[in-house]
Amino acid sequence: MTAILERRESTSVWARFCDWVTSTENRLYIGWFGVLMIPLLLTATSVFIIGFIAAPPVDIDGIREPVSGSLLFGNNIISGAIIPSSAAIGIHFYPIWEAASIDEWLYNGGCYELIVLHFLLGVACYMGREWELSFRLGMRPWIAVAYSAPVAAATAVFLIYPIGQGSFSDGMPLGISGTFNFMIVFQAEHNILMHPFHMLGVAGVFGGSLFSAMHGSLVTSSLIRETTENESANAGYKFGQEEETYNIVAAHGYFGRLIFQYASFNNSRSLHFFLAAWPVVCIWFTALGVSTMAFNLNGFNFNQSVVDSQGRVINTWADIINRANLGMEVMHERNAHNFPLDLASVDAPAVQG
């Protein structure tokens, strides 16, 4: 018997690295987008944790009145936040080497820009990594498309809005109470609750939650029993089996009788497309709404639009919202200006003497 030995071609370190990065056999897929994503998100997370614990106060309004946001400077988990960059910086790119010292960089809120820019690039790379893994496995690309909705929303809030307003100091603080403060100020300045794209976003979030709960409960309630009544129904299935685990006809029949026939899907692909598309499209619209309000194309304004025959204003709910908006606008940045912009820009009424 003759044995033939073949010499294995030696592959370079770079080739082996490429094979490892793009291998779908790894426990966690890395991918070329992952090579970028991992350091970006690690940087954003590390700086966020350190800043949340120990960052010194930041001169957010650019008026030499620093605002404390970290735990070591008197905050708790609820009130703590990474304070946005100073209005004195505006939307300038402000890396560490642009400041005269680390103290100056911290005082002007350099942490915020560093975290936000690394985070946005990181989540964009995560989306690319989803597409990359789908491509390697021969799957369709819609997982990454669905993830584009939260990526668009984060980009609108953390990047487009500050650009439109002219300063990263108008971005959302990275904390619990800071998020609510951002929402209140956004309503005061842009009347977002009266913007149709925000209304679509609310419908997407609440509707998506409702549809998810309905779908999950219907599927769980219509499992095809493969076991005896003395065993768990879960024991009758194995991961990756070809046979369906639930009876869509039974689920369709139940829901059709519960509401009406045409309110229920009888096609699994149509159903799951709808479950994915509804929240994704609605969040796309919300991101688009925030991006337009960034440039002050605001929500509907029906203030004092109802008057009687004598021209006297008949107050409506819109006027009450307007008064609430003015109150919120007066309260924020209270030391940066004497009047809210809406009041300061109106001509003073003539005084009869």
From Swiss-Prot:
EC number, UniProt record: 1.10.3.9
Residues the entry annotates as binding [CaMn4O5] cluster: D170, E189, H332, E333, D342, A344
Phosphothreonine: residues carrying this PTM: T2
Top-level taxonomic group: Eukaryota
UniProt: a quinone binding residues: H215, S264, F265
Signal peptide start and end residues: none
Record-listed pheophytin a binding positions: Y126
Cofactor note: The D1/D2 heterodimer binds P680, chlorophylls that are the primary electron donor of PSII, and subsequent electron acceptors. It shares a non-heme iron and each subunit binds pheophytin, quinone, additional chlorophylls, carotenoids and lipids. D1 provides most of the ligands for the Mn4-Ca-O5 cluster of the oxygen-evolving complex (OEC). There is also a Cl(-1) ion associated with D1 and D2, which is required for oxygen evolution. The PSII complex binds additional chlorophylls, carotenoids and specific lipids.
Positions annotated to bind chlorophyll a PD1: H198
Family label: Belongs to the reaction center PufL/M/PsbA/D family.
Subunit structure: PSII is composed of 1 copy each of membrane proteins PsbA, PsbB, PsbC, PsbD, PsbE, PsbF, PsbH, PsbI, PsbJ, PsbK, PsbL, PsbM, PsbT, PsbX, PsbY, PsbZ, Psb30/Ycf12, at least 3 peripheral proteins of the oxygen-evolving complex and a large number of cofactors. It forms dimeric complexes.
Additional comment: 2 of the reaction center chlorophylls (ChlD1 and ChlD2) are entirely coordinated by water.
Protein name as annotated: Photosystem II protein D1
